[in-house]
């Protein structure tokens, strides 16, 4: 993140966890509001202490989190939510198409048997919802494909995007790329979502897989035009 991220009100919270048979570095994000911090994605099981440490470094207690927004229901984003909610009295929000997977009414869409403890969803999101933050308005964008109700969060005043898994940057060189086909059930919708992102003015992106990327609209348009081929 830029050096002035503390003033900007948006902070990446990179955590390294054991997930399945892999060691992953993942990037939840904290967004400051007048009410307190909002957490974007909770990480998988075992993420709690890493998130707590990041919040402490920013001058917050874990208990200050009042809202958790899930970009989608995959276990590496939502599997740690039950543990988090044991320590935090927070509102849980996700897209209405993702809610049944989070609450346990449906099994995870990718069918990998990675069923985490279900939690209640308090607020169902839809595209066009705007959340006021200290970094300016944060708009909910519907970016389905990687998951049926995947959302990304867009800050139009600064051209800043929290992509979730609609975009990734976890290759060796950190290049901004489209979602990985092997983890994306509906690549046609995913490509449409990249095309939608290409219509926005974006200068900087945070990817859950890859972290902060200092590139935006030009690269996203390339991905859309090439059909995610690279």
Residue positions per predicted region:
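Conserved beta-strand hairpin/beta-sheet module of binuclear metal-dependent hydrolase folds
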Residues: 2-58, 152-170
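Short, structured coil segments at secondary-structure junctions
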Residues: 6-8, 87-88, 201
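Short Pro/Gly-enriched beta-strand edge/turn motifs at strand-loop
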Residues: 7-17, 109-113, 134-136
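Metallo-beta-lactamase
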Residues: 45-46, 137-144, 148-227
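Active-site HxH/HxHxD metal-binding segment of metal-dependent hydrolases
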Residues: 46-48, 54-130
